[in-house]
Amino acid sequence: MRLVFAGTPEPAVPSLRALIESANHEVAAVVTRPDAPAGRGRKLMRSPVGALADEHGIEVLTPAKASDPEFLARLRELEPECCPVVAYGALLRQTALDIPEHGWVNLHFSLLPAWRGAAPVQAAIKHGDQITGASTFRLVPELDAGPVYGVVTEEVRDTDTSGVLLERLSVSGAKLLVATLDGIADGTLRAEEQPADGVSYAPKVEVEDARVDFTAPARAVDRLVRSVTPDPGAWASFRDERLKLGPVSIVDEDLGLAPGEIRVERRRVLAGTGSAPVALGEVQAQGKKRMAATDWARGSRIEQGERLK
């Protein structure tokens, strides 16, 4: 099929690459978010999807809004049969959805109808899901509510961060997306409506959502930290400054630590929770580089009874 692909961040790159390499499809153009400042110099940078398209000489469209008349006119001129979309990052209105013959097919990183929204991988880890996956579905105006073409499942490992899990899903999801488009093209695949039961939502994770509540049980602390690693990154307040926290380890010992109370040992730094303590891995104080918690603790001269809040 003749395709126009929409996507922006790194997790969308495997899907675009797989479609470029597919013998059954032609990527006529790519739609991505406008170039944005990045890096220390804050220079305007092409999105990862846009950069891959440039490498292959594919036309790149960067509308400020997907409802821009000029963009819609160019999309009609391209005459796509289908528009696959992976983490594009902008709202697509009905005027755009109606253009391709086979609609827009979205790759979403959850087993729909679970975790509709911007942060499905983070939600799966935070809530302790043992199995998650990816779904392909036809876009409709309602958020992630369209009929589903196919799914692929993925185990959530005890050590998975959202970054690690999303990387795996982006690879397996790319294969699912190609298979879905193959099935649409040859007429062998039909979408099925999502069930009314089991709907849940995963809104965008804000910085305040990533603050660790040490009154929660250790397992909840562990899951929260992993769910927001690497973005936006877990944190707590220490001496009235923000301290970023990397993944922690649950310690199966009763040390009598109050929630957030820090205990510095020779080889580890512990913090109390609502249940068992956790051992801190890497931390990053404001204006400092990321470092082992033991190095941070030695430099901070932590006094008995000090806490992470």
Curated annotation (Swiss-Prot):
Protein's UniProt name: Methionyl-tRNA formyltransferase
PANTHER family per record: METHIONYL-TRNA FORMYLTRANSFERASE, METHIONYL-TRNA FORMYLTRANSFERASE, MITOCHONDRIAL
Gene Ontology molecular function: any one: methionyl-tRNA formyltransferase activity
Residues the record lists as binding (6S)-5,6,7,8-tetrahydrofolate: 110-113
Gene name of this polypeptide: fmt
Enzyme class: transferase
One Pfam family from the record: Formyl_trans_C
InterPro entries: Fmt, Formyl_trans_C, Formyl_transf_N, Formyl_transf_N_sf, Formyl_transferase-like_C_sf, Met-tRNA-FMT_C, Met-tRNA-FMT_N
Highest rank taxon of the organism: Bacteria
Alphabetized UniProt keyword annotations: Protein biosynthesis, Transferase
Function: Attaches a formyl group to the free amino group of methionyl-tRNA(fMet). The formyl group appears to play a dual role in the initiator identity of N-formylmethionyl-tRNA by promoting its recognition by IF2 and preventing the misappropriation of this tRNA by the elongation apparatus.
EC number: 2.1.2.9
Composition bias type Basic and acidic residues, residue spans: 298-309
Gene Ontology, cellular component aspect: cytosol
